[in-house]
Amino acid sequence: MIDVNNFEYMKIGLASPDKIRSWSYGEVKKPETINYRTLKPEKDGLFCERIFGPQKDWECHCGKYKRVRYKGVVCDRCGVEVTRAKVRRERMGHIELAAPVSHIWYFKGIPSRMGLVLDMSPRALEEVIYFASYVVTESGDTPLDKKQLLSEKEYRAYRDRYGSTFQAAMGAEAIKKLLQDIDLDKEVDFLKEELKTAQGQRRTRAIKRLEVLEAFRNSGNEPSWMILDVLPVIPPELRPMVQLDGGRFATSDLNDLYRRVINRNNRLKRLLDLGAPSIIVQNEKRMLQEAVDALIDNGRRGRPVTGPGNRPLKSLSHMLKGKQGRFRQNLLGKRVDYSGRSVIVVGPNLKMYQCGLPKEMALELFKPFVMKELVEKGLAHNIKSAKRKIERVQPEVWDVLESVIKEHPVLLNRAPTLHRLGIQAFEPTLVEGRAIRLHPLVCTAYNADFDGDQMAVHVPLSSEAQAEARLLMLAAQNILNPKDGKPVVTPSQDMVLGNYYLTLEREGAIGEGMVFKDANEALLAYQNGYVHLHTRVAVAASAVNNATFTEEQKSMLLLTTVGKLIFNEILPESFPYINEPTNSNLEKETPAKYFVEKGANIKEIIASREEVAPFSKKILGNIIAEVFKRFKITETSRMLDRMKNLGFKYSTKAGITVGVSDILVLGEKDEILHEAQAKVDNVIKQFRRGLITEEERYDRVISIWSNAKDVIQGKLMKSLNKRNPIFMMSDSGARGNASNFTQLAGMRGLMANPSGRIIELPIKSSFREGLTVLEYFISTHGARKGLADTALKTADSGYLTRRLVDVAQDVIVREDDCGTDRGLLIGAIKEGNEVIESLYDRLVGRFARKTVKHPETGEVLVAENQLITEDIAHIVENSGVETVNIRSAFTCNTRHGVCKKCYGRNLATGTDVEVGEAVGIIAAQSIGEPGTQLTMRTFHTGGVAGDDITQGLPRIQEIFEARNPKGQAVISEIDGVIAAINDVKDRQEVVVQGEVEARTYAIPYGARLKVIPGQKISHGKELTEGSIDPKELLKVTDITAVQEYLLREVQKVYRMQGVEIGDKHVEVMVRQMLRKVRVSDAGETDVLPGTLLDIHQFTDANAKVLLQGKQPATARPVLLGITKASLETDSFLSAASFQETTRVLTDAAIKGKRDELLGLKENVIIGKLVPAGTGMNRYRKVDLVKTTQDDMNVENDEVYVEQ
């Protein structure tokens, strides 16, 4: 079978009039659509069956031929071909225009392509095309210039003076004549000469013209094709007309627009035949031009054509643009069959890989499978009776459904799908009711809760799709978060609380110091009330089934609690017995202090020891990560299920509740508030005496109240009983934190007003005491602003993710090793003295570029190109090594992607990244998904200049869009020493003395200096506080410095908010922003100066001329913001579906661009498999080979080694 979708590239260009005629099946001559009485299409009209094909399958217009046997017959009465009705989706017609008409995209776009080709201004073009002025097309032997504009009056005067020696005309015909006269080769040569001398604006104009002319010359498009002689008419099914219930018709706007064109065209033909006066003809031509403009892009010029109710009509361009356009609505996202959605409820008894599917939904989703099975089992004679059985829901259907559903995973998706964990696969189990049951542990990944959330179900149909869902998407496989490689399935809320309660210790609990021969005996004692879960007891170590105990330890007693015995039973045997929440206990073994000799006085030893802290959420997360590291996926998911069950069971048994009596108001609160008030009064006194400024007074008042709140918070936390239910909830990490507590029992503290400025009157009451009316009113500001911000933030963050995905969607792991000799030198990221991201975090899962040696002993810690694991990273960090040279995406040489070595470990699996992994999209999701957690606006802590640097989401946008930052820092362009800091008028100037020259920098008013005289400074370093503009930095330094700066800044924003993201994700994005260069001098290559080129294209062009011994081109690297970078991509399909659709398509058509279909988006658009993952060619060409016994033996050996 021929594969329709197997084409290599897609090309777009201008259509010549002949090409348009060759597409067409006939000319549309009349504006009629459908006859209102017979409801049949009118002949030669917009829905004509003769042109576009029959309305009913195998039936001509007049009914002479019906049935499939006349296939291909053309009816002799009505001229309709007997064929399928769906040809009405593909057959085009055309309109022969009575006068040439300009295409608005090429005339009106920015820059005007027609204007660039003719070297005329868009204003002049508009005057000619819309019949306001004449243009000289042939000057003859008159003093007139070609392309000179003449008004009506001037034209008449010249006609009288020179007669017919010159030619001038109006409208698109005149422009067409000029376009036909142009000699591309001559113009291009002339412009290339001009470029050698031209400067400033003339140079930019010349570069733009050269680009367009070269495009026409290389693509084989004729410039005159920008003027239309023939207008194509799209197939009628794409602009349908449907009858509504009231007998009225609803029609697509395009039909109205086509009707206006046909009416005006026919009227113009008639006027020309009649030989009407030129002024009438001109007016009609202008109206035809406007009608065609409206059809192609309504509203681009002048007022849009409106339909009933003053609604602008949707033209052809609008059909492509925006979220509702063809690209984003129908090509990039389609609605699919075999899907359903319902409300979710919790399924606490499900296994990690299961979900509960409502019976009726499952029956509908798996209908075809059930039908096939019914027929195969002989329960139904044919498909039709099987279908009837299902529709009547007969009892035998359910048994068949059960068997069909086994081993057939389904996909569950929750919107918004912010990262790849928003769609996971589960094995369905049938449940009663109409709600989908979801495993509680996957809620974190979906960000789901059960307050009415809904989820969608999709069924993978083919066996390949099922296999992929099972192997790659099963919930039990997705334990780690792709953004940081930490477990994403940590228990939350009840589960945390239950495990916390289970591992509590309590001094003097019932039965303290009892000794048991094994865990069962201890449990028996607990069930009969002799001991409590929290009782500290001793158990014979030999009876605790743990492989990490030494022989000596096994002969001793283990001090623990009954709860911890229960808790440790969920862990694998070879895992240490966890008795205290410390890393050494987790990673190595149970500390020796918990083992005592048999016969020792157990009660005394226990009584002399402090209580050990219970296991909070963080510890549970560490346990999961450690288990995952040692035992891989299956064991981890089993352990998670056991942990979940324990948590639910014991949070139920604990019966932890919250009552008003649990909130005890602090006694010393009034005293602290009095002290603070006295300090505030003192500050106000100082201000009134003029000792301090208004700003200082404000800042001091704010800090006094903040400190008072902190003191209250500290004392409150100390005074709390460790058994206080609210404390237990917050301490375990189940719900709430210290600040909630302070607000309940201490004081609410300072609030911000709607503009973000902090109100200096604090709220002194707590919720327990109750607020005054004024305090309540002040509180509402903050609450309302919080809600408004959240709504805005979600939209902003979603748009950021969309732009990130778009710029990185074609970054795929393409090869094993690119063989680069460059690397990235990394150290810990610091802000002042605070470490934002440690060297350890940056090293794990990367390949070393150069050998790392111990600074003192010289011993090799990491060899070149070796993977740095957690253990190696610890050793490197502890050895005192400050910087390491690693392989990085920044320095990778792979085209259209990265290689395995430069990318390093895949964070989502903890193993090497596979060739075909779509790392670009994963990077975009990892950066975009936490976007909603970042704060929105800058907080103003009073008007201290320089402190208002942007943070949170706006800062991330600023970085990725490469905008000039707010509060920009001045940077030094040279290496040198700060020679002096001078005061000039009301500003300061910094003089930097280099080896050769001195530079003077004016410091903006209000900026704070970072340097002092005599200090050494290197180029690209800041002289003042603030953010550096990356574009400036690129001018002064090199690409590496800019890459490192952007990486550091992004990490700063996220880490400050407590969000961890792997460096490699940011690296992938930043690399995409720096992949273009701007050609400054073309040398002897055929690239054009001033154009943006991909680095690889540029090096290829240079390599070609260097081999011939010619002069290579030179270029500067360019930093593009992500929006700009997406639009500059080589793929026009990807760019057009992103933003500015018409501009991208206009440009691509003129250049005759080829889309090589390398990225993911382009392939989704044309309906091919994406070239990533199993869609890559190297995986598609796999053949099945019969295995022999020898192969089996080899494979078994390999498997054995891996264990």
UniProtKB/Swiss-Prot annotation:
Family annotation (HAMAP family): RNApol_bact_RpoC (MF_01322)
Organism: Bacillus cereus (strain ZK / E33L)
Entry keywords, A to Z: DNA-directed RNA polymerase, Magnesium, Metal-binding, Nucleotidyltransferase, Transcription, Transferase, Zinc
Disulfide bonds: none
Protein name listed in UniProt: DNA-directed RNA polymerase subunit beta'
Cofactor: Mg(2+); Zn(2+)
Cofactor: how and how many bound: Binds 1 Mg(2+) ion per subunit.
Binding site for Mg(2+): 449, 451, 453
Any one GO biological process: DNA-templated transcription
PANTHER family: DNA-DIRECTED RNA POLYMERASE, DNA-DIRECTED RNA POLYMERASE SUBUNIT BETA
Residues bound to Zn(2+) 1: 60, 62, 75, 78
